[in-house]
Amino acid sequence: KDVWVVVFLALVSWVLLKLPAIWGQINEELFYQRGLAIIVFNGIILFTMWQNRDFNKKNILTYGLPLAFVALFISLLPKSGGDSIVLALIHTPLFLWCLFGLAYMGFDYKNMHKRMAFIRFNGELLIMTGLILIAGAMLTGITIGLFSAISMDIEHFYVEYIATLIGMAAPLVSLYLIGLNPTLTRKIAPVIARTF
């Protein structure tokens, strides 16, 4: 069941990411500057809540209201401005990361053990997501190379659609794999540490 939730959230995130291409009136640069973090973290937070089965009214409001406020605030910022807009854009993913932490802890922010577990989990998530993205980049290179060998140029299509879908799915797949096998990244991390 979790696999289908991952697929659904990845597809929804990907469709939201492609909104400027679907609806030509959206300024692509502004959209990605202001909306990318919201799209990515929204999928991650929703899947975390799904894993924890935390969809009660209080938790939905605790997650939904701040997210809606941030999305509205960011969208209403002037198109061009000074350092205050840059700072707002920098702090948006940090704020969303805090919301992700709340969701991971089951909204029990007073529990110190859960706080420490979340800090540790971030490292595991980064490692797993990084490995998936590296594998995706290798797959992209191999696929484009194979099609080039038969004189078919699919680079634009692949990067525009498939690669972006892989990018949206990577953190969600990482969450799923870590939930499925929590010791997986703990075995990988020492190998990476010894390698570098």
Predicted regions and their residues:
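N-terminal signal-anchor module of multipass membrane proteins
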Residues: K1-L46
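Extended aliphatic helical segments
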Residues: V3-V7, V12-V15, V40, V70, ...
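Hydrophobic core of alpha-helical transmembrane segments in multi-pass integral membrane proteins
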Residues: V7-P20, L61-L76, A169-S174
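Membrane-interface helix-loop-helix junctions at boundaries between adjacent transmembrane segments
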Residues: Q25-R34, I44-I166, L180-R194
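Extracytosolic (periplasmic/ER-lumenal) interhelical loops and adjacent juxtamembrane/interface segments
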Residues: T140-G141, L172-Y176
